[in-house]
Curated annotation (Swiss-Prot):
InterPro entries tied to this protein: HB_polyprenyltransferase-like (IPR006370), Prenyltransferase (IPR039653), UbiA_prenyltransferase (IPR000537), UbiA_prenylTrfase_CS (IPR030470), UbiA_sf (IPR044878)
Pathway: Cofactor biosynthesis; ubiquinone biosynthesis
Broad enzyme group: transferase
UniProt organism field: Edwardsiella ictaluri (strain 93-146)
Entry keywords, A to Z: Cell inner membrane, Cell membrane, Magnesium, Membrane, Transferase, Transmembrane, Transmembrane helix, Ubiquinone biosynthesis
UniProt GO molecular function: 4-hydroxybenzoate polyprenyltransferase activity
Record EC number: 2.5.1.39
Entry keyword annotation includes Magnesium: yes
Catalytic activity: all-trans-octaprenyl diphosphate + 4-hydroxybenzoate = 4-hydroxy-3-(all-trans-octaprenyl)benzoate + diphosphate
Membrane topology: Multi-pass membrane protein
Entries under Pfam families matching the protein: UbiA
Protein name in the entry: 4-hydroxybenzoate octaprenyltransferase
């Protein structure tokens, strides 16, 4: 019996960290890899690659924990989230806070192996990760904060590789914010009816019937900023093929969300993993 309880507790911790749903980690990983390769113009060293890869998974898990802690009184009223570990009682609030501290501690231990500039930037990363879950109580733009949080690994990567933050770094950061707001709005469209009922704010609610238009404009801005990054870094043809394929996927996503059906909006959101991967492969082949 004790073994079953321990196993259930372990599974609850895994679910709280979204180990069973790696899409969030991947959407955070691809921009990190874009920056690591672009910052040095070549493949990063093994140490940097290991530190940033592990850091992505630790901080994404920490972000999920603090998000669920912040939403613990709301998730039970939403169909998609009512079975999460905190609202269903599989884990206590104290256990969630302890896990958050552990994950942040592991992430900071990794950052301490890097230079001082990267360490200072990591403080902002933690602030953004903590701020995002609470912003949706007061603003319809939590997706913008999420975009900054998901993209903060970009200036950190540039700092770790070259101890500088050139224009291409901030253009890539801006592109990632536009992309993140676009795909997380698709994600928020899944929960829009529930969020309206319980008073949670999101860009999906803010944009209303113009949601598809705004998502399209954000996707266009993402592509234009990526083209600018390619020009500044004098990247070869493979990169631009990657941007073109990303544009094709954006068109496909627009088709998916036409009727705003929950399952189709979620499929559009999930499709963004391929966008990130294709762009990374384009960078890889262009350098």
């Amino acid at each position: 019996m004790e073994g079953c309880v321990a196993q259930s507790k372990w599974l609850a911790y895994c679910r709280l960290m979204r180990i069973d749903k790696p899409i969030g980690s991947l959407l955070l990983l691809w921009p990190t890899y874009w920056a690591l390769w672009l910052a040095g113009g070549t493949a990063p060293g093994g140490k940097l690659l290991l530190v940033f890869t592990c850091g992505v998974f630790f901080m994404r898990a920490a972000g999920c924990v603090i998000n669920d802690f912040a939403d613990r009184h709301f998730d039970g009223h939403v169909k998609r989230t009512c079975q999460r570990p905190l609202p269903c009682g599989a884990l206590s609030e104290r256990e969630a806070k302890a896990l958050f501290v552990l994950l942040v501690g592991l992430s900071f231990a990794l950052v301490l192996t890097l230079n001082a500039m990267t360490i200072w930037l990591s403080v902002a990363a933690l602030t953004l990760a903590w701020l995002y879950p609470f912003i949706k109580r007061f603003s319809h733009l939590p997706q913008v904060i999420l975009g900054m949080a998901f993209g903060w690994s970009i200036p950190m990567a540039y700092a770790a590789v070259g101890e500088s933050l050139p224009l291409s770094c901030w253009l890539l950061f801006a592109a990632n914010i536009c992309w993140t707001v676009a795909y997380d709005t698709q994600y928020a469209m899944v929960d829009r009816d529930d969020d309206l009922r319980i008073g949670i704010k999101s860009t999906a609610i803010l944009f209303g019937r113009y949601d598809r238009l705004v998502i399209g404009l954000l996707q266009l801005a993402t592509l234009l900023l990526l083209l600018w990054v390619g020009d500044l870094n004098q990247l070869q043809g493979a990169y631009y093929w990657g941007v073109l394929l990303a544009a094709v996927l954006f068109v496909y996503q627009q088709q998916l969300i036409t009727r705003r059906a929950r399952t189709s909006c979620f499929r559009a959101f999930m499709n963004n993993n391929y966008v990130g991967l294709i762009l990374f492969l384009g960078i890889l082949l262009a350098l």
